[in-house]
UniProtKB/Swiss-Prot annotation:
GO terms for biological process: actin filament organization; endocytosis. Residues 1070-1176, 1218-1282, 1312-1343 are annotated as: Disordered. Belongs to the TRAFAC class myosin-kinesin ATPase superfamily. Myosin family. Residues 690-712 are annotated as: Actin-binding. Residues 1077-1111 have a biased composition (Polar residues). The keyword Hydrolase does not apply. Myosin is a protein that binds to actin and has ATPase activity that is activated by actin. Myosin I heavy chain is single-headed. Dimer of a heavy and a light chain. Inability to self-assemble into filaments. This is Myosin-H heavy chain. One of its GO terms (cellular component) is actin cytoskeleton. InterPro entries: Dilute_dom, IQ_motif_EF-hand-BS, Kinesin_motor_dom_sf, Myosin_head_motor_dom-like, Myosin_N, P-loop_NTPase. ATP binds at G154, E155, S156, G157, A158, G159, K160, T161. Residues 7-57 form the Myosin N-terminal SH3-like domain.
């Protein structure tokens, strides 16, 4: 298959003078002349074959690397840039060059998310960007430990400065990463600029622009110097350690002779117009008010006040060019920015004044004029009638004298400086003589001084900037750091009139281009060598000849120029003549036809014609030693210091490169001894500076950025083709394309080549299926399909290479146009385009063939259908005709049959009529005969009837007679009947009366039964009330008995305590007199050997009679008397009553059922109730007895109520007496407060007494004896134990161990743990899970220290602060063993540190009664020697804040802390905060705090909030540090498919376990929030990667990503409910939309409705970026995204060009607090969702074993007490 490069009608590019290139169609070939082409305007043009420019295939439209274009030429390049610029893709690669087109608008592609996306990514994976070049330079610097350089070039206004800023921004972010900062999770406000070197470099930009930029014909802010910024990095970490700025090639001639219609440097114009607003003037006015202000400073200001009234037209240097302003620029406002930048760099007011004075002196020096002197060839200074300085002439009586003003400003002698202008000294041997200057030479000496001053000032500013940004010093450059240099230099220039400036600029660009060509050749060579292809015959162009033409000695242009500059009588003509004579034969040098002062140089970017009229003047840079001496002898300290600083820098090799930044002059006063007049040409300085720059660049690995200016109007979306094409030529881009085109610019890996173009040769192999070649091809295809990646083993690559060779042979491609590398195919320019045409044509042919087959199939199917329809239609017609014939025959037969029927009918009618007539006649005859016979018979019958009637009448008369005789005998019978009826009525009335009576009796019986039932119910109710009354009465009696018994016991114990206290105090006083140091032993012996005897706290109540316990108890209670009249009998009795507030938790915790005891039934008065329903009428006697018994019960109830009221009254009186007399005995105890409220209290609560029918009297006695359940003690300790808190200076352990109460505690806990009824056993409700015993309530058991003991231990001796901190240290010290340790509770697991701290300290803040108050004999809480009472709130707050600080110091700063540990401490702070919030809510109406206490509590709350945020950040950092590398590795691994699901879900399982409610007390909503944030982070990371990477933005990558997303969603649904799965999975919606878009037809997105339905979350800007980056798969038949779709998206009203298309990772993990009354919340949850529910009662009821902590705290307290006693004894 032979490829014809021009097969078919192809699209070509036609040159156009206005647009550069336009579209054209190739019509036909004209033999011997070329090709005939028709352009887009319809004009036909003949183009030679060599000039033909073919268009590239559609798939390469808007490609991001133009070296991949099949046809490499200017037209293709400019078209590609236009297409990319239309969609705001301003960056494009051309090989290793990055082309950056200035968009003249702000684009959202420079965010920190974009920086994060480019970090650690290869250039080939991401779209072109300035960050990509920066990343490449940064990674190569660290990986190869070699310095890098980035060369940024372009015209003025092309964006070089902005590009430099973006490079510095990226390097700063990399420096932050080197310090371990995750830049993706920190906002821009969080980045600290303390060591932000790049920010300081950027801030120096206004200074350099003011002193080094000027207005030119093509740019209002053209940089007239080059700068090289070195960013210094640490070799290992990659952090920024410093920076350095070097300047090159300052255009000094612009100071004295700006070109026509251009300006000098901006600073002159800014100073004149903006000095009125200078900060120096404001500061001077303030200094005048200060008596100590120096007079010299005021004199300096006075010298500058002349600036207030001058203008640019007053100075020769500023007005000579005819331009002194810029349209749209206010120089006065720019001056303020410049001055602020100088202040930022650290310049003082005196230094600012010094700068202004030098600038003003330069302007006045420029106003010095000369005239001829009296002697020949002499000159003198012209005084009076000056052409300049009109604003100054009025002030001076003698007229304006610029020389005098200049000398005054510089502090120099007028005579010494004057002589340097008009004459010079020459030495000949030992003699010296003076030579006068001509007027022209005097002007040159004047200008030389001005340029010298300005260049030195510029160099000094650079030195000062370096002092500000160079943190480590240049002396360590070779050893301690690496650097990346950024070169910002003006690009190639070519105007209608080109002078000396353009010559030097183009010379510099020629050198840079030469270095660039060698670098490109080197890169190409490395690529070819890597792939091992034959490249020896490839020729690369070189511009060395042009460089030799300019700089080669002795006959180079620069050498001839310097030679001519030293001859006084040289002219431009003589200069050009020498050039013509020496270089006329050079191919890079031409002589113009019509000019003798011009010459042409053929540069790499094209030919440039130079005008030499000002070459000689601008090349001269005389340095007169007398001028230097005059300046150095100045009495102005600033000027002399300036020269000294520069001299040190130059002698030390620092500063600008070779001093060439502003001229490189090293002359000083020492030069006066050798030569009084030294000539140094600008060109030689320029050459030296350039060579130094090239040496620096050559020592680095260079990278290139070419900035392009799209139009001169500085408008967005305006592209000037011709202007851009010119810049491409000047920037070397076209040259680079030419170099690439000379080699093999098109490259494809074997796998991609086979996949994309296999369909072209598929037909050839298919035609010969049996050949070995076809079999080999099929095996290659299988291997290619199995290995989708570009890599593989060597055998696989070799197999693919064979496949590529087979394809090349089948395609008949010239073997000289192809090179087979190790992994790639290399093609000459145009081959890929032809392959694309063939592929397109093959696809078209295949589509045509498929259409042909399909159309044949459809037509054949239609024909068959038509044929079948026709046959069927014919059959229908035939059937219809046959049916018609059949119907006709049927009708004929029917007619014949009908006729026969009609005839038959007529004959039948006739026969029937005759028959009926005959029959009728016969009937008439027969009737006549019968009538006669009937009449005869009737006459006979009448006669018979008459005879019979006569006979019957005779018989009736006889019977009547007999009846009349019988009637007379029936009258008597009737009378008897009437009598019987009367008797029957009487009997019936009697029966009715008896029935009514029976009914009445029955009704009365029913009423009595109803009354009996009601009375029975009332009886049962009264019996129940009677039982309750008896129970209450008995409980009151038991309570009174217990109170009385406890009083006597307590009185005995108090007496025992007082005696021991007195004995102990006596011992202490005796030992203090002896100056003994054994107080610790005394305290210890007292603590642990004190009163240990325990009396039963409650006596048994009186035993009741077994016959009738209820009535006996009532009788006994009625006979009981209540004593208590004396004060002794009621002393301290109220100490036995426990306050409800102290045991609020126990009362709420235990709700015992109260079972009533019913009295025995009276069997005498009440019959068998079960038989009542069987009795019809209740006997009256039983009813009366029942009514009587009811009255008795009612009366008994009233009696019991009165008795109970009397008992209550007596108990109340007893309690009042106890309260009145409670203070007397306690005041006798030394060291114990007399306030009885501080003592411990005990209360006995009512509990149930169960009395079943099966219970025995022995059980009742045992219940009463054990006090429980009838008298449950809710206190956890005995009164003696509680009193220990008031005698802290003596001991820690209780004076007595209440064995009775401890046994009850254990027994109650036993029943709680075993699920038995606590009402039938003993309990005290302490809730201690460790104090368990058998139900028998044994007194012997082992007691363990609980949290209550720990609280008491902490309060020991009022050393709470010091012992509390010691407790915190113990917790933190054992943090490894304490991690994942939780205290079980009914709310869930509570972290142990949070539980201990909340019970020991946090509770004390909100519990005033439990707060420890210092006693007069106690020390302060810290164990120090303070006196007075210390605020307990402050003590507890300080301990908790100390805990926060220790955790942050030990845990959070430990790099070894894993996620589980961090989650554990996160749960601690979260739990503490929620407990504190619950306390705030519960006690806000009860506590009355002063302002100081409120401030302390608020401080603690803020500290906890801060720690929660820090804990959250640490957890997030640990999570992201694990997940982020996994995602990066999965997305970047080319050897396998994307798979990040397994490692992430495994890690999520760990997080879920660490934060689950089963393990720690973390609110479920907080866990949900964390997972939502985590999934948002995954969504944002992958989304940002897809949006910027071509290898991910394709169909092939979208499938595995979708699978991983589905797996993640499945994991969430599997481990959490619907609420979690819906909200958490919703965080991946943006990623799911992107994946879906990658899979569908992209043309659907043009429709607004479909687009909103497909991707409702995705913004238009993000969608446009996604489609811009999308590239079809190599073997896909899909076309690239049409640019029309992208432009339509950009035209949408919803499109926001300033939108940040990437998701901000720093705003995902947010956790904030709403206000003081609300809890944690975030951007994704409501205000109260994150608040955990805390049950304070449940929390306080939990007892936890802490023996070790108690033991350690006790030991610590003993040490503190001992130390304090020693201190007190010493005092």
């Amino acid at each position: 298959m032979m490829i014809d490069n021009n097969c078919g009608k192809e699209k070509v590019w036609v040159p156009n003078p206005e647009k550069g290139w336009i579209n054209g169609d190739l019509i036909k070939e004209i033999p011997g002349e070329g090709w005939l082409v028709r352009d887009e305007n319809g004009k036909e043009i003949k183009i030679e074959k060599d000039e033909l420019r073919m268009q590239n295939p559609v798939i390469q439209e808007g490609i991001d690397d133009m070296t991949s274009l099949s046809h490499l030429h200017e037209a293709a390049v400019i078209h590609n840039l236009i297409k990319r610029y239309e969609i705001n893709s301003i960056y494009t690669y051309t090989g290793s060059i990055l082309i950056a087109i200035n968009p003249y608008t702000k684009l959202p592609i420079y965010s920190k998310e974009m920086i994060e996306s480019f970090c650690d990514q290869p250039v080939s994976k991401l779209a072109p960007h300035v960050y990509s070049i920066a990343e490449s330079a940064y990674r190569e610097m660290l990986n190869f430990q070699k310095n890098q350089s980035i060369l940024v070039s372009g015209e003025s206004g092309a964006g070089k400065t902005e590009t430099t800023k973006f490079l510095l921004q990226y390097f700063a972010a990399m420096g932050e990463k080197g310090n371990g900062v995750n830049t993706s999770l920190i906002s821009e406000e969080d980045i600290v600029e303390g060591n932000n070197i790049e920010t300081q470099v950027i801030k120096s930009t206004p200074i350099l622009e003011a002193f080094g930029n000027s207005k030119t014909l093509r740019n209002d802010n053209s940089s007239r110097f080059g700068k090289f910024i070195e960013i210094h990095f640490d070799k290992i970490k990659g952090t920024i350690v410093g920076a350095k700025l070097e300047t090159y090639l300052l255009e000094k001639s612009r100071i004295v002779k700006p070109p026509e219609n251009e300006r000098g440097y901006h600073i002159f114009y800014q100073l004149i117009k903006g000095f009125n607003n200078s900060c120096c003037l404001k500061n001077s006015s303030n200094n005048n008010k200060d008596e100590d202000s120096s007079s010299s400073s005021n004199n300096n200001i006075d010298d500058l006040k002349s600036l207030l009234k001058c203008k640019a037209s007053d100075f020769n240097y500023l007005i000579s060019s005819g331009c002194d302003s810029i349209d749209g620029v206010d120089d006065s406002q720019v001056f303020i920015k410049t001055e602020n930048a100088l202040k930022v760099m650290g310049l003082s007011n005196d230094e600012l004044i010094g700068i202004y004075k030098i600038l003003l002196s330069i302007l006045h020096i420029g106003n010095i004029e000369f005239e001829k002197g009296k002697e020949e060839d002499s000159s003198i200074i012209k005084y009076g009638n000056s052409s300049f300085g009109e604003s100054f002439s009025d002030d001076d009586a003698g007229g304006y004298n610029p020389l005098e003003i200049s000398c005054k400003l510089l502090g120099c002698s007028v005579d010494s400086l004057k002589s340097t202008f008009c004459s010079r000294k020459m030495k000949a041997g030992n003699e010296s003589y003076t030579i006068n200057h001509t007027v022209e030479q005097a002007s040159q000496a004047r200008d030389s001084l001005s340029m010298f001053l300005y260049s030195r000032l510029f160099d000094w500013l650079v030195v000062r900037i370096n002092q500000s940004i160079d943190k480590i010093g240049t002396e360590k450059k070779d050893n301690s750091f690496l650097f990346i240099g950024i070169l910002d230099i003006y690009g190639f220039e070519s105007f209608e009139s080109n002078s000396y400036e353009q010559f030097t600029i183009n010379y510099a660009n020629e050198k840079l281009q030469n270095q660039f060509n060698h670098q490109i050749f080197k890169l190409e060579q490395l690529e070819y060598e890597k792939e091992k292809i034959d490249w020896s015959y490839i020729e690369f162009s070189d511009n060395q000849e042009c460089i030799d033409l300019i700089e080669k000695k002795p006959l180079g242009i620069l050498s001839i120029l310097d030679e001519e500059s030293q001859f006084p009588k040289s002219t431009p003509s003589t200069l050009c003549t020498k050039l013509y004579n020496n270089h006329s034969k050079s191919k890079n040098f031409e002589k113009p036809r019509f000019s003798q002062t011009h010459f042409i140089i053929d540069h790499y970017a094209g030919k440039v014609e130079y005008d030499t009229n000002l070459f000689l003047e601008k090349n001269k840079d005389f340095i007169i030693s007398e001028q230097v001496s005059a300046l150095e002898s100045s009495n102005w300290k600033f000027l002399t210091n300036l020269f000294q600083i520069l001299s040190k820098k130059m002698n030390g090799g620092g500063g600008t490169s070779g001093g060439g930044g502003a001229g490189g002059n090293k002359a000083s006063s020492s030069a006066a001894g050798k030569s009084t007049f030294k000539f140094t040409s600008v060109s030689s300085q320029f050459k030296e500076s350039l060579n130094s720059l090239m040496t620096t660049i050559n020592s680095t690995n260079p990278h290139y950025i070419r900035c392009i200016k799209p139009n001169t109007e500085k408008r967005a979306n305006l592209f000037d083709n011709v202007m851009v094409l010119h810049q491409l030529r000047c920037s070397g881009v076209i040259e680079q394309l030419r170099i690439s085109r000379s080699g093999y610019p098109s490259r494809l890996v074997y796998d991609n080549f086979i996949k994309r173009y296999k369909l072209i040769v598929a037909k050839d192999f298919k035609n010969d299926d049996d050949s070995n070649e076809s079999k080999e091809w099929n095996s290659i295809l299988k291997e290619t399909d199995l290995n989708s990646s570009n890599g593989g083993t060597n055998n696989q690559i070799e197999l693919k290479r064979k496949g590529a060779e087979l394809m090349i042979n089948k395609l008949s491609i010239d073997i000289s146009s192809v090179q087979f590398g190790l992994t790639k195919l290399f093609f000459k320019s145009g081959i890929i385009a032809n392959l694309e045409l063939l592929r397109s044509q093959t696809m078209i042919n295949s589509a045509t063939f498929i259409q042909k087959i399909w159309r044949g199939y459809t037509d054949r199917k239609a024909y068959t259908s038509t044929k079948h329809s026709s046959i069927y239609f014919q059959s229908l017609i035939r059937s219809y005709l046959q049916q018609l014939e059949y119907n006709s025959m049927v009708e004929e037969n029917s007619a014949i049959h009908l006729q026969s029927l009609i005839r038959t009918n007529e004959l039948e009618k006739q026969f029937n009529q005759l028959l009926s007539t005959t029959i009728h006649f016969q009937s008439l005859l027969r009737r006549l005969e019968d009538s006669k016979e009937f009449n005869t018979l009737m006459d006979r019958i009448k006669k018979i009837v008459k005879i019979q009637s006569l006979w019957r009448s005779n018989l009736a008369k006889k019977q009547l007679k007999l009846l009349k005789a019988e009637a007379k005998s029936l009258t008597n019978v009737v009378a008897e009947k009437n009598k019987l009826a009367s008797k029957l009525g009487d009997i019936q009335s009697k029966l009715d009366m008896e029935s009514q009576l029976a009914q009445k009796i029955k009704n009365e019986n029913e009423q009595l039964s109803s009354q009996f039932s009601n009375i029975q119910i009332e009886k049962e109710k009264l019996q129940k009330d009677f039982g309750n009354i008896n129970l209450e009465k008995e409980e009151l009696l038991l309570k009174y008995s217990a109170l009385e018994s406890e009083y006597h016991q307590y009185k005995q114990q108090n007496e025992l305590i007082i005696s021991k206290l007195k004995q102990h105090i006596n011992d202490l006083e005796e030992k203090q007199h002896q100056h003994s140091y054994k107080n610790n032993e005394v305290v210890g012996n007292t603590s642990f050997e004190g009163s240990t005897t325990t009396n039963n706290g409650v006596t048994s109540p009186p035993k009741s009679s077994p016959a009738s316990p209820i009535r006996n108890s009532i009788n006994s209670n009625s006979d009981t008397t209540i004593s208590g009249s004396s004060d002794d009998s009621i002393d301290n009795t109220d100490s036995l009553i426990l306050s409800p507030k102290q045991h609020k938790g126990e009362d709420r915790k235990r709700n015992h059922e109260i079972s009533s005891i019913s009295p025995p039934r009276s069997r005498e008065t009440i019959g068998h109730d079960d038989d009542d329903n069987n009795v019809d009428v209740i006997p009256r006697r039983q009813f009366n007895e029942l009514e009587k018994e009811y009255k008795e019960l009612k009366q008994m109830d009233e009696t019991h109520k009165q008795y109970i009221e009397s008992l209550k009254l007596q108990i109340t009186q007893l309690e009042e007496k106890v309260k009145k007399s409670s203070s007397h005995p306690r005041s006798l105890l030394p060291g114990i407060p007399s306030n009885i409220n501080d003592s411990p209290k005990v209360v006995y609560t009512k509990s149930s007494i169960t009395n079943d029918n099966s219970s025995s009297h022995h059980q009742q006695q045992q219940q009463q004896h054990n006090i429980s359940p009838s008298n449950s003690i809710t206190s956890t300790t005995s009164p003696i134990n509680m009193m220990d808190s008031n005698i802290k200076s003596l001991s820690y352990k209780d004076f007595t161990n209440s064995q009775e109460i401890d046994a009850q505690q254990q027994l109650h806990q036993y029943h709680l743990n075993n699920g038995t009824n606590p009402a039938t056993s003993t309990t005290n409700g302490s809730g201690n899970p460790l104090s368990q015993s058998s139900p028998t309530g044994s007194d012997k058991h082992i007691q363990q220290s609980t949290i209550s003991d720990l609280v008491s231990a902490l309060n020991f001796n009022n050393c709470q602060l010091e012992s509390g901190k010691y407790l915190v240290d113990l917790i933190i010290k054992n943090h490894d063993s304490i991690v994942s340790k939780y205290v079980p509770s009914e709310m869930g697991g509570i972290p142990e540190p949070a539980f201990i701290l909340s019970r020991c300290f946090l509770k004390n803040i909100y519990d005033v009664d439990a707060t420890v108050i210092g006693t007069p004999n106690s020390t302060n809480s810290g164990g120090g020697s303070g006196t007075g009472v210390l605020d307990p709130i402050e003590t507890n707050v300080n301990i908790l804040i100390y805990f926060c600080d220790k955790v942050e110091e030990v845990i959070y700063r430990d790099p070894k802390s894993n996620c589980s540990a961090l989650c554990y401490w996160f749960s601690n702070f979260y739990t503490l905060f929620n407990i504190m919030e619950t306390y705030n809510q519960d006690t806000k109406d009860q506590l009355s705090l002063n302002d100081q206490d409120k401030a302390l509590i608020e401080k603690l709350k803020i500290t906890l909030q801060t720690m929660i945020v820090k804990a959250h950040k640490n957890v997030v950092k640990n999570i992201t540090d694990y997940i982020q590398p996994i995602l990066h590795k999965s997305l970047n691994d080319t050897t396998s498919e994307i798979d990040f699901m397994d490692p992430i879900t495994n890690y999520l399982n760990q997080i879920q376990i660490s934060l689950s409610l089963e393990n720690c007390y973390i609110n479920n909503n907080l866990c949900k929030l964390l997972f939502e944030q985590l999934f948002s982070f995954i969504n944002a990371m992958i989304f940002n990667e897809i949006l910027l990477r071509k290898d991910l933005c394709c169909l092939r990558s979208s499938i595995p990503i979708k699978m991983n997303i589905s797996e993640l969603e499945h994991w969430v649904k599997l481990h959490h409910g619907k609420e979690w799965s819906s909200s958490v999975c919703d965080k991946l919606r943006l990623l799911k939309e992107v994946v879906y878009i990658l899979m569908i037809d992209k043309t659907q997105l043009q429709n607004d409705e479909l687009r909103d339905e497909i991707c409702p979350t995705l913004s238009i800007a993000q969608l446009k970026q996604l489609l811009t980056m999308y590239s079809p798969d190599v073997d896909s038949f899909e076309d690239p995204i049409p640019l029309e779709i992208l432009t339509s998206l950009m035209d949408s009203p919803k499109y926001n060009p300033d939108e940040n298309i990437l998701l901000d990772l720093s705003k995902i993990f947010t956790l904030k607090f709403i206000n003081s009354n609300q809890t944690l919340s975030s951007s994704t949850s409501s205000e109260n969702d994150l608040m955990a529910t805390i049950n304070l009662n449940a929390l306080e009821s939990v007892q936890y074993a802490c023996d070790d902590l108690v033991s350690n705290i006790v030991k610590k307290n003993i040490e503190i007490v001992s130390l304090n006693n020693q201190k007190s004894i010493k005092k």
